[in-house]
Amino acid sequence: MQIGPYQLKNQLIVAPMAGVTDQAFRNLCLRYGAALAVSEMLSSNPEVWDTDKSRQRMTHSGEEGIRSVQIAGADPELMAQAAQFNVEQGAHIIDINMGCPAKKVNKKLAGSALMQNPPLVKDILQAVVAAVDVPVTLKIRTGWEPEHRNGVQIAQIAEDCGIASLAVHGRTRQCMYKGNAEYDTIKAIKQNVSIPVVANGDIDSPEKARFVLDYTGVDALMIGRGAQGRPWIFREIQHYLETGNKLAPIEVAEQRQVMLEHLTKLYDLYGEYKGIRFARKHIGWYLDQEDQRQFRADFNQLETAAEQYSLVEYYFDELVQN
């Protein structure tokens, strides 16, 4: 798949997820085979660009691969300025968020709320594309609500405005993350535009990845929640797409190494206090089985990086011995 001048090495992309796809997580996913990892959403409001959270999200030092930065907002001029600012900070691709279903984003008429207003969608896309000399991509949902799936209309507007590729989550804004993603609308979008289309939603196994590619005819897949606590899913899916065979489950020693490295990267990125808190949710995703409940409870009580690191080491030492 090609996005502007950038040829992706395969069909697997990491979905942008606020509070999840920071630099530490993106680099892990890239190492395990993702072709592209999109950053966390950044507000187009310049008043928040100087906050610690925004500065961390804008940091690209040590970033591996193609740098795609997602921006969100509802004002065409501010969105254009945000795009320019992030290109100056090192973004290779600007991604526009019209897919986030969160209430705090939608109440500002941003994210997937924009799909209710096609003229404003057009104004925003035209402004951002004109403002930068890098490819601009777009992420949407299938529509605002099940009765109003206007994804094809928005996709055609995107193509007319010069959007380089389009990612579509297979639910409406109203659906949030409930129920199952549907791929009929994504298939229809692919059939009605000539720009690359990326399918997103409930792609959590190699078999599901193969099904979605075949059913929709899309150019690539975007994986979000399926990679939480499992960055190696990209390796598993790519192997299956290439060979038709499933890889053996990740070995305990490798999982231990990944988790400990992830902890270290979180502490380095956020400092000990914030790093500890981010580590709690990531470790909760890595070890999410019922028989790991006590470990999660114990881990979440720890207040130092050294204690967290040591407990993960101890957990895997016990696992190997038993």
Curated annotation (Swiss-Prot):
Cofactor(s) it depends on: FMN
InterPro entries in alphabetical order: Aldolase_TIM (IPR013785), DUS-like_FMN-bd (IPR035587), DUS_fam (IPR001269), DusB (IPR032887), DusB-like (IPR004652), tRNA-dHydroUridine_Synthase_C (IPR024036), tRNA_hU_synthase_CS (IPR018517)
Record Pfam families: Dus
Source organism, top-level taxon: Bacteria
Gene3D superfamilies reported for this sequence: Aldolase class I, Putative flavin oxidoreducatase, domain 2
Record-listed E.C. numbers: 1.3.1.-
Protein family: Belongs to the Dus family. DusB subfamily.
Protein name: tRNA-dihydrouridine synthase B
Gene: dusB
